[in-house]
């Protein structure tokens, strides 16, 4: 990720809030509305927040977009759970959440990394400065 100047454009966006444990129910509701996501448990969301962090945008009293990290180390963090409710897409909400998350990670000298299989999401990541370093395949047994 190199395009730090683009990331700074969104840095002061007050719509983006940090996910707290009290918001887990609303996060679960968002997951239920995004077909591309597997449905997590409350416990798995809690565990994810213990090993990472997340940011969200709330509209109409519901969380409509989010981006999270997990498996943070002293040098890297995996970006996960980037998604937006279908009724609120194409408004830049996921981008704002990713930017907030990445800015915080970069300020802590951590490199954000991610996997994606959605080409539309890939376009956002590339626009933000992520670079492809390889491809991955999942084999099922």
PLM features: residue spans?
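Helix-loop element at the rim of GNAT/NAT acetyltransferase active sites that forms part
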Residues: 26-38
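A short beta-loop-alpha structural element at the N-terminal edge
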Residues: 13-27
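Conserved GNAT acetyl-CoA-binding A-motif
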Residues: 105-117
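A conserved beta-strand-loop-helix scaffold within acyl/acetyltransferase catalytic domains
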Residues: 36-83
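Conserved active-site alpha-helix within GNAT-family acetyltransferase domains
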Residues: 118-135
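Acyl-donor-binding surface of acyltransferase catalytic domains
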Residues: 1-14, 139-141
């Amino acid at each position: 990720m190199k395009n730090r100047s683009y990331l700074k454009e969104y840095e002061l966006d007050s719509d983006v809030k940090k996910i707290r444990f009290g918001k887990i129910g609303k996060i679960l509701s968002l997951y239920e509305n995004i077909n591309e996501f597997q449905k997590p448990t409350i416990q798995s969301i809690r565990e994810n927040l213990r090993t990472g962090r997340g940011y969200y945008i709330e509209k109409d009293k519901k969380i409509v977009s989010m981006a999270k990290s997990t498996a943070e180390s002293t040098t890297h963090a995996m970006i996960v759970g980037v998604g937006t409710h279908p009724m609120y897409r194409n408004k830049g909400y996921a981008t704002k959440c990713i930017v907030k998350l990445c800015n915080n990670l970069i300020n802590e000298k951590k490199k954000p990394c991610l996997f994606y299989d959605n080409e539309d999401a890939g376009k956002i990541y590339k626009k933000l400065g992520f670079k492809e370093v390889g491809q991955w395949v999942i084999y099922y047994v």
